């Protein structure tokens, strides 16, 4: 698993995985490379991309472009999550919960990279089932998309934020 971090303007880019894959044809095998990347602004915007090409740099470039085009907004609460969230994709399941200041990002592998570029600073996270990086990233993004701020919930229900929080 390789990690490369670059600053493109204000976006943080992380390379999560590069994999060699092959296509078997009559004359033998044709090798190509896949790359999984995440891109974020460190302030609640994050996206991931998966690129494939005959050469590693081209695969990484394609993945970065796809990640930039597929960014989502995440409602963060002062560097942590709004509430505990679960996400799943195929055989991967993830659970993330907010943590107090100073905890750091307690998460493994692909999930850590997504949370870092999204701007989450304190979180407790666990991946269950398959730990395939692509599926873990998709499950993490799905969980972050499902997270709603109290303001969003209040607006949907037509109530005040105080009523939602029970204050």
From Swiss-Prot:
It comes from the Bacteria. Gene3D superfamilies: 3.30.160.20, 3.30.230.10. It holds the Pfam family Ribosomal_S5_C. Residues 11-74 form the S5 DRBM domain. Keywords: Ribonucleoprotein, Ribosomal protein, RNA-binding, rRNA-binding. GO terms for biological process: translation. GO terms for molecular function: rRNA binding; structural constituent of ribosome. GO terms for cellular component: small ribosomal subunit. The N-terminal domain interacts with the head of the 30S subunit; the C-terminal domain interacts with the body and contacts protein S4. The interaction surface between S4 and S5 is involved in control of translational fidelity. With S4 and S12 plays an important role in translational accuracy. Belongs to the universal ribosomal protein uS5 family. Part of the 30S ribosomal subunit. Contacts proteins S4 and S8. This is Small ribosomal subunit protein uS5.
């Amino acid at each position: 698993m390789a990690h490369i971090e670059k600053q493109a303007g204000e976006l943080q880019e992380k390379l999560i995985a590069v994999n060699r894959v092959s296509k078997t044809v009559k004359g033998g095998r044709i090798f190509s490379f896949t790359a999984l990347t995440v891109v974020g602004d460190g302030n609640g915007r994050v996206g991931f991309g998966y690129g494939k090409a005959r050469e590693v740099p081209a695969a990484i470039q394609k993945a970065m472009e796809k990640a930039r085009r597929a960014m989502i907004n995440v409602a963060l609460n002062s560097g942590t999550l709004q509430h505990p969230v679960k996400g799943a994709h195929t055989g991967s399941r993830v659970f993330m919960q907010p943590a107090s200041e100073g905890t750091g990002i307690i998460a493994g592998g692909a999930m850590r990279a997504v949370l870092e570029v999204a701007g989450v600073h304190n979180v407790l996270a666990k991946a269950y089932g398959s730990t395939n990086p692509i599926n873990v990233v998709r499950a993490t993004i799905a969980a972050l998309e499902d997270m709603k701020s109290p303001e969003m919930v209040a607006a949907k229900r037509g109530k005040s934020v105080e009523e939602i929080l029970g204050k």
